[in-house]
Amino acid sequence: MKFSKRVLLRLKNKNKKLKPDKYKKLKRESVRGLIKGTVERPRLSVFRSNENIYAQIIDDTTAKTLVFCSTLDRDIKLNSENGRTCDASRLMGQKLAKLSIKKNITKIVFDRGPYLYHGRIKALADGARAGGLQF
């Protein structure tokens, strides 16, 4: 029997049949299925680990990364004690906005992936907005 992605996500809550990695993959695909980056509005993709956060602006039509930034960058490491804080994510969002504006990218589509729009993800988005990007 084949189920749709939404049905599988509901089954996760009821039966606990899906493994966590499969659930995360389904959730990522359900969010990404609605979002496509174009030449006019590329996609800002976010990856969060326990220690750091990474973001890249991607043009999906040519499948190329236009701008990349992470909390491992030297400027951000010097200004914050570690990459786990919301302040580091906010600084990274501002730096990402500066780099993208240099490449004439002002309008983007935000792809939060499987993560909730909360905490470090929200701080990154707020920093990018403060830097001049439009979502």
Swiss-Prot record:
Cellular compartment(s): Plastid, Chloroplast
Protein name: Large ribosomal subunit protein uL18c
A GO term for molecular function: 5S rRNA binding
GO biological process: translation
Keyword Plastid set for record: yes
InterPro entries: Ribosomal_uL18_bac-type, Ribosomal_uL18_bac/euk
The keyword DNA-binding is annotated on this UniProt entry: no
Stored PANTHER family: 39S RIBOSOMAL PROTEIN L18, MITOCHONDRIAL (PTHR12899), LARGE RIBOSOMAL SUBUNIT PROTEIN UL18M (PTHR12899:SF3)
One GO CC term, this protein: ribosome
Keywords: Chloroplast, Plastid, Ribonucleoprotein, Ribosomal protein, RNA-binding, rRNA-binding
Subunit structure: Part of the 50S ribosomal subunit; contacts the 5S rRNA.
Lineage: Eukaryota, Sar, Stramenopiles, Ochrophyta, Bacillariophyta
HAMAP family in alphabetical order: Ribosomal_uL18_B
Function: Binds 5S rRNA, forms part of the central protuberance of the 50S subunit.
